[in-house]
Amino acid sequence: MARRTKVRIVCAIGFLCAVSLSAQEVVRDTITGKVHQIEKVTVTARRLPNKVTSSVPIQTLSQQDISQLGIQNMADAVRRFAGANVKDYGGIGGLKTVSVRNMGAAHTAVSYDGVVVSNCQAGQIDIGRFSLDNVSVLSLNIGQPEDLLQSARMYASAGVLSIETEKPHFENERNSAFRVQMRGGSFGYVSPSIRWWQKAGSRTSFSLNGNYMRADGNYPFTLVNGKYVTEEKRNNSAIYTYQIEPTLFHTFKDSSNLELKAYYFYSKRGLPGSVTLYNPISDETLWDENVFIQTRYKKDFSQKWSLQAQAKYNHGWNKYEDKGNEYADGLYRAVHRQDEYYLSATALYRPWNV
């Protein structure tokens, strides 16, 4: 018994020594007791509007929401917003407008990267021509926008549909990124698109987005004429559209931002018209072309003072053509052209921060 007791005492002493030795090997914490500086962190995502503190109703759809819901075009995305009235004037490639409060599309502004899109001839904006491939945030304000740093055009509208495109961001220290997509559907619908991001320096990046869409639209339908029932096809429904959009992003040393964007859109579409008995001929054609160059500059002088300046040149052109014996030369043609120069500057002063 005495020998066993001695063995136990020796083991206990050895265990305590091991514990004390291991405690002495613990290195002191070097995190606390001094200030540490981390490397610069760059945030590339668009800032979402604050729905909680907003004084007006605001609804948003992020790029992730659009992908999860399987939305394929701008009109379907805007239909997700409560209170938005989207009118479709012709299916694939047709005019699509948005309005709020039943005041008409002329009273709803469409903002593309912070600059209002305009069409002086029609008075309403076709949202169907904008692609969802490079959209980062889509938001709808019913009333005045929450962001006070806006132009007078946006304040004069009953509602604002804001489209913010995606800003280039690079993973794994890459200097470029490239993506190709292809969509397809019924009646000859094909729509390929490309996206190219390129880093031009530590403060400068470049993006190029382009897409092409074509469709026949000659879907079949049943025509009932008394006791005669025939199977017909919709004629003169083909559409071809091209869109290209280069954008330059630059951040200055004082953290001010500059965005320079160019946009080109061209479309040629047939106008099928109404179904007329014994007359399937339809020769109406519409061409549309839109080019604009816009720039936006934002700078925060302090926590109280901010400045935003915008400049834009917009060129619109469309041509309508119809063939028929009712015209003097068998052809009717109408061409419309519009050019617009736009400049806006807004200063914001915050007496206090809440």
Question: Over which residues does each language-model region extend?
Answer:
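Outer-envelope beta-barrel architecture signal
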Residues: 108, 174-178, 183, 190, ...
